[in-house]
Amino acid sequence: MGLYSHSSLSYQGASPREALESLRDEIVGCVPALGKLRKFYRSDRALTISVGASPQANLMANLLGKDPSESCIALEMHGHLRKFSNSEIEGFKVSLEIHAGVYSIMDLQQLATRARESYEGNEDEIALSVIAEVVSVYNESEREQPEVLIAVGTLGLGREPCHNYRGWGVVSSRSSSSLVSSKRRLVVERISQEHSNLAWEVADGEDKKSLPPIPLEIGQSVFIYPNHACFTGAMYRSYFVVDSTLKGRENRIQAVWDRAIGW
């Protein structure tokens, strides 16, 4: 029994500071609600304040493996957690709970929030990707820029935006050895119901005619990291599990996880 709040606005943040301020404001905002509940419950009733979203779960990682005094963010977090966790507020014994969100999976939206003080790249942080087949390649000036048509669209990726780039997904460098050394990202630039178009990510005003060919071939499979893992993951009944630490066998399926269906 307790209060449940979801910090949806925190997805627009871009720093640990913004994630912390969102968490602080959300917790503080629950206090007046506790006061309103006081007349309905005994004073010795234990309640849980359940707050946060994926950025706040990632924020907690700033506390792992370090002395809080080494980080201003971690030090402030400790202060808020001590104040609101396992203490008495508005006459109730209160414990604090932070929503895990997609902490164990991650996605491009979460990397964009920069809620943790340090991140690795997409390849090391994001556990969910969608495999799609290349069905057409346009590298011969047929279009304004090099493009690749793939057999997945909104029904397989979702259509959730990410605030730090214009695209609907990012192609993993696992898709082609040529992408590993590329200084550009290959992104899902346009998306329709059942197909989408890949293109090089470009800066505003950049001449697209000078872009290099996309190193993919018809029939090849590409791995795409989604903007929002919740939407993308909900579209599939099962997940193929691989182990990226197994050198030479990174793409071998180790298990199949069936998804719980329904709400």
Predicted regions and their residues:
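Active-site loop/helix belt of alpha/beta enzymes
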Residues: 1-118
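C-terminal accessory subdomain/extension
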Residues: 139-263
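A general structural signal for short secondary-structure junctions and capping/turn motifs
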Residues: 39-41, 87-90, 124-126, 137-142, ...
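Short, P/G- and charge-enriched loop/turn segments at secondary-structure junctions
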Residues: 118-122, 183-185
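Short coil-to-beta-strand transition motifs
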Residues: 59, 123-131
